Regions:
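Solvent-exposed loop/turn segments at secondary-structure junctions
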Residues: 52-54, 81-84, 98, 112-116, ...
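A generic secondary-structure signal marking the coil-to-beta-strand transition
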Residues: 88, 104-106, 198-202
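Acidic/histidine-rich catalytic neighborhood of metal-dependent amide-processing enzymes
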Residues: 128-226
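Secretory targeting signatures
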Residues: 1-24
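Structured segments of extracytoplasmic/periplasmic soluble domains
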Residues: 45, 49-52, 65-73, 115, ...
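Catalytic-core environment of secreted peptidases
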Residues: 39-42, 48-49, 90-165, 174
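Solvent-exposed, acidic/flexible segments
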Residues: 32-39, 55-63, 85, 133-141, ...
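A non-catalytic alpha/beta surface segment that caps or lines the substrate-entry region
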Residues: 28-32, 38-100
Length: 229
């Protein structure tokens, strides 16, 4: 039940964060303590750091801010050199007092970098400028930052890992291998024990749209099964 409460909080946060004016949703979120205003304010903080391009001072400031404001977690910087970038993943762990080598794990993840160029901007004068990253990058971090305030109070029976990955959005549209570099590095360094203990991996990304639409997607192997339901 305690783990389900965390999952419910996360799911509600993805609804309540961009639409905090909804009375029905907010009354539920109040019970679970997720504060959409806190999350929104943290987006402002992130944007004020500047573009979070891998290796930048803004990236370092964001990592330091996250660690300093959420000291209940055991934080670790995980640097890599991939695709021409010096990137740094940030991983924090919160373990129950009775944790063992077999305690199950829930991973909550988001990327914190912002793209180095806005090639889709309708203003041609802006296409070579970095994006602010309020939604793409900032919104996922905001949800995890607010959840990191709540989680230590829930007395969960799982280990909770918060993972902020770097160099996710710096790739070339012509080469899929140049994207999600931080996540690839993290995944490649997971041990078999880590994999066996992981009960859930939840990725939060781009949930800050004013007109948020969340679509259900299925692996190809499930398409026929879903269509028959």
């Amino acid at each position: 039940m305690r783990t389900m409460a965390l999952l419910a909080t996360l799911l509600l946060s993805t609804v309540a964060f961009p639409m905090i004016a909804s009375a029905d949703v907010c009354s539920t979120v109040d019970v679970l303590e997720f504060d959409g205003n806190n999350a929104n304010e943290s987006v402002t903080t992130q944007v004020e750091f500047g573009p979070r391009i891998p290796g930048s001072n803004a990236s370092m400031e964001l990592r330091n801010w996250f660690m300093e404001t959420r000291p209940e977690f055991d934080w670790r910087l995980d640097p890599h050199h991939r695709g021409g970038y010096n990137l740094t993943n940030l991983e924090g762990k919160l373990t129950p007092l009775d944790s063992t080598d077999e305690t199950p794990v829930i991973v909550l993840a988001a990327h914190y970098d912002s793209r180095h160029r806005a090639e889709r901007d309708p203003n041609p004068d802006m296409t070579e400028q970095p994006i602010p990253g309020a939604n793409d990058g900032g919104s996922g971090v905001a949800v995890l930052w607010e959840l990191a305030r709540i989680i230590p109070t829930l007395n969960l029976d799982h280990e909770i890992w918060i993972l902020l990955t770097d160099a996710e959005d710096q790739g070339s549209n012509d080469d899929p291998s140049t994207w999600v570099l931080g996540a690839r590095a993290w995944a490649e360094n997971q041990t078999q024990d880590d994999i066996n203990r992981t009960d859930a991996f939840l990725l939060v990304d781009m949930i800050g749209d004013a007109d948020l639409k969340i679509y259900r997607t299925f692996p190809p192997s499930l398409n026929n099964e879903e269509g028959n339901r």
